[in-house]
Amino acid sequence: MGFPKEGEKVQIHSYKHNGSIHRMWEETTILKGTQSLVIGANDRTLVTESDGRTWITREPAICYFHANYWFNVIGMLREDGVYYYCNLSSPFAYDLEALKYIDYDLDIKVYPDMTYTLLDEDEYEKHSKMMKYPPVIDTILKRNVEYLRKWIHQRKGPFAPDFVDMWYERYLMYRD
């Protein structure tokens, strides 16, 4: 598996466990790319849903992908602070087409005061049965929910103070 290079513009593709496309982000600028970590940024990028509907993101976002964890984190810069959306997902893969991951339904929304809510447990239960997630996936995802909770409480990784602001400043250097 390769990895995207700094300054490169890539698509992000999210899939479901059964291999079907879930969502695509048209353009994300890579700010850091290594075998184990990718940090990207986008602002007002086109998003295409699996049913063909499209929408445009409303605010700048910093995207954090790690090869050793089963989640990715999007930090969204809004007027009243940074909001985070954490997707429980497979670790990322990259090919010349896009940065890719499998979305496993569960999400954690984190507010600027670092309180958070676990979302979509019902969707996870439904898809787990429908797509026959193996028990090992359930174990891995539950462990990674706990990792995320610890990171949020410890302000670690993408939740560290100034993490999103620092990477957003770097992103501004690449804007056209």
From Swiss-Prot:
<feature type="binding site">
    <location>
        <position position="105"/>
    </location>
    <ligand>
        <name>Mg(2+) 2</name>
    </ligand>
</feature>
<dbReference type="GO" id="GO:0017110">
    <property type="term" value="F:nucleoside diphosphate phosphatase activity"/>
</dbReference>
<dbReference type="InterPro" id="IPR035930">
    <property type="entry name" value="FomD-like_sf"/>
</dbReference>
<feature type="binding site">
    <location>
        <position position="123"/>
    </location>
    <ligand>
        <name>Mg(2+) 2</name>
    </ligand>
</feature>
<dbReference type="GO" id="GO:0000287">
    <property type="term" value="F:magnesium ion binding"/>
</dbReference>
<feature type="active site" description="Proton donor">
    <location>
        <position position="23"/>
    </location>
</feature>
<feature type="binding site">
    <location>
        <position position="87"/>
    </location>
    <ligand>
        <name>Mg(2+) 1</name>
    </ligand>
</feature>
<dbReference type="Pfam" id="PF04167">
    <property type="entry name" value="DUF402"/>
</dbReference>
<dbReference type="GO" id="GO:0017111">
    <property type="term" value="F:ribonucleoside triphosphate phosphatase activity"/>
</dbReference>
<feature type="binding site">
    <location>
        <position position="107"/>
    </location>
    <ligand>
        <name>Mg(2+) 1</name>
    </ligand>
</feature>
<feature type="binding site">
    <location>
        <position position="120"/>
    </location>
    <ligand>
        <name>Mg(2+) 2</name>
    </ligand>
</feature>
<dbReference type="InterPro" id="IPR050212">
    <property type="entry name" value="Ntdp-like"/>
</dbReference>
<keyword id="KW-0460">Magnesium</keyword>
<keyword id="KW-0479">Metal-binding</keyword>
<feature type="binding site">
    <location>
        <position position="107"/>
    </location>
    <ligand>
        <name>Mg(2+) 2</name>
    </ligand>
</feature>
<comment type="similarity">
    <text>Belongs to the Ntdp family.</text>
</comment>
<dbReference type="InterPro" id="IPR007295">
    <property type="entry name" value="DUF402"/>
</dbReference>
<dbReference type="InterPro" id="IPR016882">
    <property type="entry name" value="SA1684"/>
</dbReference>
<feature type="binding site">
    <location>
        <position position="103"/>
    </location>
    <ligand>
        <name>Mg(2+) 1</name>
    </ligand>
</feature>
<protein>
    <recommendedName>
        <fullName>Nucleoside triphosphate/diphosphate phosphatase</fullName>
        <ecNumber>3.6.1.15</ecNumber>
        <ecNumber>3.6.1.6</ecNumber>
    </recommendedName>
</protein>
<keyword id="KW-0378">Hydrolase</keyword>
<comment type="function">
    <text>Has nucleoside phosphatase activity towards nucleoside triphosphates and nucleoside diphosphates.</text>
</comment>
